[in-house]
Amino acid sequence: NKEKGFLIFTKKMIMRLKDKTALVTGAASGNGRAIATLFAQEGAKVVLADINKEGVEQVTADLQQKGCEVLSVVIDVTKESDIEQMVSTAISAFGRLDILINNTGIFDMLVPVADTDDALWEKVLSINLTAPMRAIRYTIPIFKEQGGGVIVNTASIAGLTGARGGGAAYVASKHGLVGLTKHVAFCYKEWNIRCNAVAPGRVDTNIRDNSKKALQTSSKDGCLSEDMAKITEKIAMGYATNQRKAAPEEIAKVALFLASDEASFVNGSILVADGAWTAY
């Protein structure tokens, strides 16, 4: 009985998101799936959002079978109405929203600026920067009314460097997200609202494959081969210093810390998780 009581006590102690409601975008795979899974295991009620209907519903079903209180919503983050619906779904289902994880992202396949057409630029920024801004815009009033809340954005080391982690559009979008993170943190700290970002390096996800399918633009195929060869060679020099990719679960643990009360005085921070890649 004593052993059982200790286990129950220990379980309660590690439920860092008990009684919290979290909304995770890009939850069908990769970092988003790992974050949603970990948050649910830590006691949160989780709304999983993704454009991949089959994928997000499968992840949700898997978590429900394990006794987690979760639901899914299929959205296109480039549509403002879908973002509004996503937030309202969380409120309707669980009565509150405590944590917003802006994780949906798209990669630009390292296309340099001279070969970036408007379609590629606008697509990448709409998903990587405009969508998080809109989600935050809809969430802030809810957080203010509730007396606080937490936002965690999935940035990238590309938001802290010039070309190491992506092409022109991707780098610009992630720099913008880093700036947005700091802006939100400073402007709304008096309402007990925290906004931070995790900046991963290389992670073992399917973002490249998903991005190839999503990018309907000539840029991905129209980059001058000579330019691309030079750029790829330079980027590969950085890869050589840090060849191990992170597992999505490693990034999820960083997001968990930032979302939890353990990070109560962490606000406006960009937490790099890149295995020392940018330390070189």
Residue ranges and their predicted role:
Residues 16, 94, 133-136, 244-273, ...:
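C-terminal substrate-recognition "lid" of short-chain dehydrogenase/reductases
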Residues 17-47:
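Canonical Rossmann dinucleotide-binding motif of NAD(H)/NADP(H)-dependent dehydrogenases/reductases
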Residues 136, 173, 181:
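Active-site helix of classical SDR
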Residues 141, 186-187, 264:
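Alpha-helical segment proximal to the catalytic Tyr-Lys
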Residues 156:
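Residue(s) in the substrate-gating loop at a strand-loop-helix junction
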